[in-house]
From Swiss-Prot:
SUPFAM superfamilies: Class II aaRS and biotin synthetases
Protein name: ATP phosphoribosyltransferase regulatory subunit
Subunit structure: Heteromultimer composed of HisG and HisZ subunits.
An annotated GO cellular component: cytoplasm
UniProt cross-references to Pfam families, sorted A to Z: tRNA-synt_His
Task of the protein: Required for the first step of histidine biosynthesis. May allow the feedback regulation of ATP phosphoribosyltransferase activity by histidine.
Main subcellular location of this protein, as a coarse class: cytoplasm
One biological process term in Gene Ontology: L-histidine biosynthetic process
Organism from which the protein derives: Stutzerimonas stutzeri (strain A1501)
Other noteworthy facts: This function is generally fulfilled by the C-terminal part of HisG, which is missing in some bacteria such as this one.
């Protein structure tokens, strides 16, 4: 192996160096503190689990993004986590087993076998919050509000929200008695807004249902979209009407809480359709093609762990959040340079300063004071009249 190959990293795998690593860690602490103030408890899940647990309740996409290895102890196949959400669902359903609502949050590195989009990282730091045990619109409102508070804390500018509800399409597809294959083909056409293809796929359906399914591709835009949807879907089944009202209720409350955040609706955009069961939402900023934070309701995820619970939540990539935000994440780097040696009182003075929160760098044997500035020190610890005191580095 050539020397150059020893330090090359795989495509999409990054290391974070000073001072950026300190900025990311500061952001992580601030966001987790925010979650804690909202009542969310931190959980730390393992980097690797048996594959069945990691892929529970997820679609094929997560399977393709998961690195697989063989456990040398058990011989079973394991996966390196590509998404922390299923792990937290396992914690809620199988480990905690609480009866009432449970609020959990997390932050940790994940690894993707394949990037989610062109030029995206395969080693993001996933950060998120989940609310289990409540099926009402109030929990959807809470997690979306918390996500917006997180983006505000990071000072991400020009955020706009995209809201939808997969229950609308699910209800119409069920009423039309579409086969699994037909439902998937129509879903794909809706994502591309391929109107000719949508017309063809719905041609043999009941005219009223066909009209409503075709309307989904056109129901996108601002707040007026919901009024248009009420008219276009007036004959839809009760479940579709309920989903539309949930969407409207949450949107109204968000508009009151965050009037500065534009809301956009697209009833044909079914993000996470094979995973989510209710409201879906995502935050976007100009100039970035992918959502910067996203989430939704996924009420069936705990079933494979023996305990289905209503659930909703969101996640983001912490590195992306820091890169887009304008929050001041700098940490004081000034420090005190302490000399090398074992003079009386030196070690005690160094320990006292560190306990007071000072950053103290002690010289190594043979290291000169000339290195102090490079190490971020602007002061020095010196012996004066038998007492160790802090003075300017220039003195």
């Amino acid at each position: 192996m050539a020397t150059v190959d020893r330090w090359l990293l795989p495509d999409g795998i990054e290391e974070v160096l000073p001072p950026e690593a300190a900025r990311i860690e500061t952001a992580r602490r601030r966001v987790l503190d925010l979650f804690q103030r909202w009542g969310y408890e931190l959980v730390i899940t393992p980097h690797v689990e048996f594959l069945e647990s990691l892929l529970t309740g997820s679609g094929q996409d997560l399977d393709l993004r998961t690195f697989k290895v063989i456990d040398p102890l058990s011989g079973r196949q394991m996966g390196l986590r590509a998404d922390i959400t299923p792990q937290v669902a396992r914690v809620d359903a199988h480990t905690l087993r609480r009866e009432g609502p449970s609020r959990l949050c997390y932050a940790g590195s994940v690894l993707h076998a394949k990037p989610q989009a062109l030029s995206t990282s395969r080693s993001p730091i996933q950060l998120g919050a989940e609310l289990y045990g409540d099926a009402s619109a109030s929990s959807d409102l809470e997690v979306i509000s918390l996500m917006l508070e997180m983006l505000e804390l990071a000072d991400v500018p020009d955020v706009h929200m995209d809201l939808g509800h997969v229950g609308i399409y699910r209800g119409l597809a069920k009423a039309a008695a579409l086969s699994g294959e037909a439902e998937q083909r129509l879903f794909d056409a809706l994502q591309r807004k391929a109107m000719d293809e949508i017309e063809q796929l719905t041609a043999a359906l009941d005219p009223a249902l066909a009209s409503m399914l075709r309307a989904l591709a056109r129901l996108c835009g601002g707040r007026e979209t919901l009024d248009d949807a009420r008219h276009a879907l007036a004959a839809a089944p009760a479940g579709v009407q309920a989903a539309l009202e949930t969407l409207a209720t949450v949107a109204d409350q968000l508009a009151l809480r965050y009037p500065q955040v534009p809301l956009y609706f697209d009833l044909g955009e079914l993000r996470g359709y094979h995973y989510h069961t209710g409201m879906v939402f995502a935050a976007f900023v100009p100039g970035v093609g992918q959502s910067i934070a996203q989430g939704g309701r996924y009420d069936d995820i705990g079933a494979d762990f023996g305990r289905a619970r209503p659930a909703t939540g969101f996640s983001t990539d912490l590195k992306t959040l820091v890169g887009l935000g304008n929050a001041d994440l700098t940490t004081p780097v000034a420090g005190i340079w302490a000399p090398y040696g074992d003079e009386s009182g030196l070690w005690g003075a160094i320990r006292d300063l560190r306990r007071q929160g000072e950053r103290v760098v002690q010289a190594l044997d043979g290291q000169s004071q000339a290195d102090a500035a490079q190490l971020g020190c602007d002061r020095q610890l010196q012996l004066s009249n038998g007492i160790w005191t802090v003075a300017s580095l220039a003195s």
